[in-house]
Amino acid sequence: KYILAAVLGFAAAACNTDGCLDNQSSLPKAGLFSSATGNAITLSNIEISGVGAPGDSVLVAPGTAVSEVYLPMRSTKQSTAWRFRYDQEGLEGLDDIVTFDYESQPFFASEECGAMYNYRITRCTTTYNLIDSVVVADSLITNTDRLRIKIYFRTAQTPETPDTPDEQG
């Protein structure tokens, strides 16, 4: 009896697909931040698209509010570049290009999940029109849904009103 129960238990566990993570692609998640304050920001006047990517590579269209974006990499290449085009009066032609150099690493997750590619970012370069800097917080890109890249933008700041001392009479 006990052997039959154990065999049935193992068989049921082997057929279970709940162990597979929902996200089976390694996509680097990037967040947008203000270089002045360090706080997360939301932009709606930006288009983000792939440079030299086949077909329609627009990830974010102008008018779409975005504070985080997944920037897919290509397993057959060692570099991927993204264009940040600003759709705002006075900023025409001030596109920024962010380029990631990386190594593709095949990874076998499990029988249920199968295989995927992980990526190790080896270098990141950018132009500096409205992007102030790019920080790669974790160079290993896996299928874990975590913010790994922080893109800091130059943002306009409203001047703070200086405190005025109370007048004493």
Q: How does the language model describe each region?
A:
Residues 35-40:
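Primarily extracytoplasmic ectodomains and periplasmic/lumenal surface modules that are beta-strand-rich
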Residues 15-20, 72-169:
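Extracytoplasmic cysteine-anchoring/structural motifs
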Residues 42-94:
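Tryptophan-paired
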